[in-house]
């Protein structure tokens, strides 16, 4: 769960003018050619969207617009794709976003309408209503839940810890439970949104699914750190890696949150990790390294 840079709306007027037009198909006139005044009415809805930080409002549905104009804007959404008339909207949205801002698990591959286009038709091609998400997050969102999720562009997340994980070792395996901290220093409306999406997107289950495969990559490092410096070495390794990943991603990304929790778990650091992540080769590698250092020091 993280913020993304707010897209520019400098081309908003030109975008509407580009995708709204009439054409003839099988001797039948289709499409919609808005007047200048109608374009300004749509831009006023964009202004209201910005002012209310993307929160749901009846006025954003365009009750003052004609049904034909609302429908034409909604049907213009495919024009944001590669071969459409306004592909820059999609290109800009995905630029420099390598991970879904909601889950932090998978890369974004789809544009989500923060306020659903089936309900808020005038916002169908508005750049600030289009958020890049992964397939799983976008697929789990329901149109009826518009406004219940944190807005990646407008709901500014303060630099506080709100995601936490309980860790335990059971039957030789690592057991994790992710949750949102009710005591986190967040405005109540924002906290409610984050808690809602944690449940609605099944983030705890999705994080847990990736925990074991992620930790396997740290097997050798953990064993070597422990063999050379004991439990303190394990803690140092976990905290150092957590610092690196928190800087790379963000403090509430599920991976650094997990590493910090493991660093604080005495049972895991003082040997429990060997059961969870067995590696018979790590001890040999540590011995070889120690022997090499001894030779070099001689």
Residue ranges: model-predicted function:
Residues 107-189:
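Glycine- and acidic-residue-rich phosphate-binding/metal-coordinating active-site segment common to enzymes
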Residues 27, 80, 96, 160-161, ...:
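Short secondary-structure junctions and interdomain/linker hinges
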Residues 65, 69, 85, 96-99, ...:
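Generic hydrophobic, aliphatic-rich segments that mediate packing or membrane embedding
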Residues 1-26, 193-298:
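C-terminal, charged low-complexity interaction regions
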Residues 2-83:
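N-terminal accessory alpha/beta regions
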Residues 88-110, 134:
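Short cysteine-rich loop/turn motifs with clustered Cys
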Residues 39-43, 108, 226-230, 234:
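Long alpha-helical scaffolds
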Residues 76-90, 112-119:
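Short Cys/His-rich Zn2+-coordinating modules
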């Amino acid at each position: 769960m993280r913020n993304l840079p707010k897209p520019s709306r400098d081309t908003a007027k030109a975008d509407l003018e580009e995708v709204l037009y009439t054409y003839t198909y099988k001797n039948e006139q289709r499409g919609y050619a808005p007047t200048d005044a109608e374009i300004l009415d749509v831009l006023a809805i964009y202004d209201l969207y910005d002012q209310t930080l993307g929160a749901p409002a009846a006025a954003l549905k365009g009750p003052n617009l004609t049904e034909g104009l609302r429908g034409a804007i909604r049907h213009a959404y495919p024009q944001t794709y590669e071969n459409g008339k306004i592909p820059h909207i999609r290109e800009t949205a995905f630029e420099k976003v390598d991970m879904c801002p909601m889950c932090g698990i998978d890369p974004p591959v789809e544009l989500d309408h923060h306020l659903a286009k089936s309900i808020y038709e005038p916002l169908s091609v508005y750049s600030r209503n289009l958020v890049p998400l992964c397939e799983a997050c976008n697929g789990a969102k329901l149109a009826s839940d518009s406004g219940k999720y944190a807005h990646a562009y407008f709901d500014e997340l303060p630099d506080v810890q709100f995601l936490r994980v309980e860790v335990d070792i059971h039957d030789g395996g690592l057991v994790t439970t992710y949750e949102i901290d009710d005591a986190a220093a967040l405005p109540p409306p924002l906290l409610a949104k984050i808690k809602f999406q944690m449940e609605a997107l099944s983030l705890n289950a999705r994080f847990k699914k990736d925990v074991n495969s992620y930790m396997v990559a740290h097997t050798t490092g953990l064993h070597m750190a422990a063999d050379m410096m004991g439990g303190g070495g394990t803690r140092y390794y976990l905290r150092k890696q957590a610092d690196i990943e928190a800087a790379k991603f963000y403090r509430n990304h599920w991976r650094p949150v997990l590493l910090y929790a493991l660093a604080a778990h005495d049972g895991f650091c003082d040997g429990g990790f060997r059961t969870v992540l067995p590696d018979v080769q790590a001890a040999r590698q540590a011995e070889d390294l120690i022997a090499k250092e001894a030779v070099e020091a001689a």
